[in-house]
């Protein structure tokens, strides 16, 4: 039996997000977030996993990640359980 091969478009995690974050997705090489702008528009933001050095903390439904620039990336998910699932999926690919 052969192992399943993951390409860079295999979806590992998806959540509807909360607040400004409308859609949060984890792929094997990146995190994609659909954010709501201040004037009602939406734009996609991509954070590559090679730039993430680890998870700083989980506070409620917010996940704080450390990146190579020593700044925090914050992702607001729909619930605390989804935040923990986000971190578990992130640890699986890092």
Regions found by a protein language model. Give the residues of each.
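Acidic, Ser/Thr- and proline-rich intrinsically disordered linker/docking segments
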Residues: 2-19, 32-35, 39-94
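Broad, structure-driven detector of short, well-ordered beta-strand segments within folded domains
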Residues: 22-28
């Amino acid at each position: 039996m052969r192992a399943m091969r993951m390409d860079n478009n295999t979806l590992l995690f998806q959540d509807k997000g909360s607040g400004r974050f409308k859609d949060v997705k984890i792929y094997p090489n990146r995190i994609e977030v659909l954010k709501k702008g201040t004037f009602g528009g939406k734009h996609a933001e991509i954070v590559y996993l090679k730039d993430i050095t680890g998870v700083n903390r989980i506070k409620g439904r917010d996940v704080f990640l450390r990146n190579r620039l020593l700044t925090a990336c914050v992702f607001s998910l729909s619930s605390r359980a989804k935040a923990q699932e986000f971190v578990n999926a992130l640890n699986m690919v890092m």
